[in-house]
Amino acid sequence: MNKLIKVFLTCTIIFMTGCYLFREPTEKPVIYLYPENTTEVDVKVNLDGKFTATYPKYHDGWKVVAEPDGTIHSLDNKNSYYCLFWEGIVNYTPDFSTGFVVKGSETEAFLEEALTKLGLNDRERNEFIIYWLPQMQDNAYNLISFQNENYTNHATLDISPKPDTVIRVMMAWKPLKESIAIQPQKLDSVERNGFTVVEWGGIEFK
């Protein structure tokens, strides 16, 4: 997928040894729905910012019928999908106070382990890595931090019926020429129970 020209509204982050003014895209968040039974589902993303792309088209939310295997049928156009896609500008300050510095050549193995621990299944993990690995594997190092409430509070999900399990993986990362010291991030394992919703996406800082 070609990169869209998208920017964050201006904000400042203290990063490494200086202050960096950044305006960067939130890329390829995709949402998967796994109800226990075939279920009509309403999905809204309440964004502190603005959308730059959605697929299928976002009409004040998505109204769909979801199957247990993850297949999604749109009630707007009767087409079927395997996920809901959005991309946009989110007004928040990513947190790099903890994270990981990973050699480019070791990024694939790192992501496989980290994403599995964070709760992604094989297909979700593979799609995440297929999208991001080409941008990361040739860097000397990658600084990686998975965002938590500082992201989800600015891009809340409103889903009806309410899911039993919600897994949201947002990776903020930056290519590095040299390794730096950083406090390791604690990754919490998530167990899937009942109606499960999964979202993943990422942000690169250059």
Label each PLM-derived region with a short phrase.
Residues T17-G18:
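C-terminal motif of bacterial Sec signal peptides marking the signal peptidase cleavage site
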Residues N2-K3, E106:
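Hydrophobic alpha-helical segments, principally membrane-spanning helices and signal/leader peptides
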